Amino acid sequence: IVASKRYGDYVKEIAESMGCFEEISFVDNDREGAIGKLEEVDTFYPEYRYAIAACDDGEERLKWNKRLEMIYNIPVLFHKDSTISPSAEIQLGCIVEPRAVIGCGSTICQATVVGANSVVEPYCLVGDGCTLKSGTIVKSTSALNIGTETEQGTVLFTPLDKQ
């Protein structure tokens, strides 16, 4: 987990809930117990094959994931208590928090965070690097621009045909 600051602990718990990672470590300049600094991130391959940025800022998260994907596999992390439709597309570097719901036919683009208890209704397009904070509702057939950030409990309806 790279460049995580406070959000990293939450992301670690999400990754642990998936039960598929043997070891989860941090690379960060400000985290006690990190395995290394940000400038050393390239040196941990092949011991670590997966890496994901967990920055609070969507643009920074996207930038880090683009850099990481040159060396590492970038996972999608989704909490075991989230619900993702089989027809939804979740792209690399996304983080789906507990009890989030992603509806059929929706696309969640790269490095987007879907917050706890958020709902992305069917047939939505959520752009790269978005941050949907807890309780956000994205109404059916909406399209969100790259880098959209919501506040808790926001309800959005931005029809695809108006984008």
Show the residue positions of the predicted features.
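Terminal amphipathic alpha-helical/low-complexity segments used for targeting or macromolecular assembly
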Residues: 1-80
